[in-house]
Amino acid sequence: RRRRRRRRHRRRRGRRGRRSRGRR
């Protein structure tokens, strides 16, 4: 059985949508 995952790029972190290191 194969499972397909759908990815939605709608996650924004910080001010620019990029993952910031160290600070949350």
Swiss-Prot record:
It comes from the Eukaryota. GO terms for cellular component: nucleosome; nucleus. Transmembrane segments: none annotated. GO terms for molecular function: DNA binding. Residues 1-24 are annotated as: Disordered. The keyword Transmembrane helix does not apply. One of its GO terms (biological process) is spermatogenesis. Testis. Protamines substitute for histones in the chromatin of sperm during the haploid phase of spermatogenesis. They compact sperm DNA into a highly condensed, stable and inactive complex. This is Sperm protamine P3.
